[in-house]
């Protein structure tokens, strides 16, 4: 008789996804980030739930309710610091996960990849509306600047902005709806994660060689379940260390000042994980052009599978394209730095060159290098 985990209608789904799943024997620690992202999502939902029990989404009390959580609620300071820094770790894991996908050609699983890009957009949206909730100076002005970008939409832009604001400026209605969205979106993200996994399990995981590994698979449990738990301990140790020792390291000092519509901060900038996209937005001196570039900076990931010209899947044995990959990593780091700098010489031109290089690498240089490698290998 089959064991319960293999016969029960619900347990067998979990069994096929987490226990008896055939996994390639040679996947490295770079394949840990999917499960780490699942852990981040669970941690964010749990800490967020406890924060929502004490938070009030009203402009007169939002800032003081966050102070109340940190001062008066049992371990409120820890929950708040874990949630705020958990977002940073979420994005670190996302960017490493995407980088792994680009390096090893995982994007050729087109459905999995495209659902992943949608997930990235969902997480970015969630983080943006969440940053507005403490109602500090950078919360307010960040919301004002970013929502205002929608006014660049032809014909209906102004109406669209006022519709999102719920009035003629970022006000109480805006905060209330942003709280509603911030509560809802992670659950939509959890559902999209399941879709992501369903598509992944249709094909099975890729591996560092980029070759078919059907002939050499091992069960997910115990091998990769324990490997994932090791990753969990590293992630949680780092998160707790940051939350306890340096909780404000990645935040903006402006957000310790309550929101004031009459005083504009000298430098309006988003959290560090959006700076690369913000730099691309600012590098185009036209409002609509900037908004389109901002969107394209993320949506360019969707065209990567269409521009795969190489006969090999992974970059493991492709030195030319490897150089371009690391150039992309350096370029994103430069864009992140530029995004946090004021709009003045020499930062403007550096940002424009880095933005041009960012799109060139995806759309022109990488496909060309792959084509050249095919020629050199006589394929």
Swiss-Prot record:
Binding of heme b b562, residues: 83, 182
Effect of residue 189 to V: In strain: Isolate BD and Isolate LP
Cofactor: heme b
Binding annotation for a ubiquinone: 201
Subcellular location: Mitochondrion inner membrane
Cofactor note: Binds 2 heme b groups non-covalently.
One MF annotation (Gene Ontology) recorded for this entry: metal ion binding
Keywords: Electron transport, Heme, Iron, Membrane, Metal-binding, Mitochondrion, Mitochondrion inner membrane, Respiratory chain, Transmembrane, Transmembrane helix, Transport, Ubiquinone
Main location: mitochondrion
Sequence intervals crossing the membrane: 33-53, 77-98, 113-133, 178-198, 226-246, 288-308, 320-340, 347-367
Topology of the protein relative to the lipid bilayer: Multi-pass membrane protein
Pfam families, alphabetized: Cytochrom_B_C (PF00032), Cytochrome_B (PF00033)
GO-annotated biological processes: mitochondrial electron transport, ubiquinol to cytochrome c
Residues where heme b b566 binds: 97, 196
Gene Ontology CC, one term: mitochondrial inner membrane
Family membership: Belongs to the cytochrome b family.
Listed PANTHER family: CYTOCHROME B
Further information: Heme 1 (or BL or b562) is low-potential and absorbs at about 562 nm, and heme 2 (or BH or b566) is high-potential and absorbs at about 566 nm.
Function: Component of the ubiquinol-cytochrome c reductase complex (complex III or cytochrome b-c1 complex) that is part of the mitochondrial respiratory chain. The b-c1 complex mediates electron transfer from ubiquinol to cytochrome c. Contributes to the generation of a proton gradient across the mitochondrial membrane that is then used for ATP synthesis.
Subunit structure: The cytochrome bc1 complex contains 3 respiratory subunits (MT-CYB, CYC1 and UQCRFS1), 2 core proteins (UQCRC1 and UQCRC2) and probably 6 low-molecular weight proteins.
Protein name: Cytochrome b
Organism: Poeciliopsis occidentalis
Taxonomic placement: Eukaryota, Metazoa, Chordata, Craniata, Vertebrata
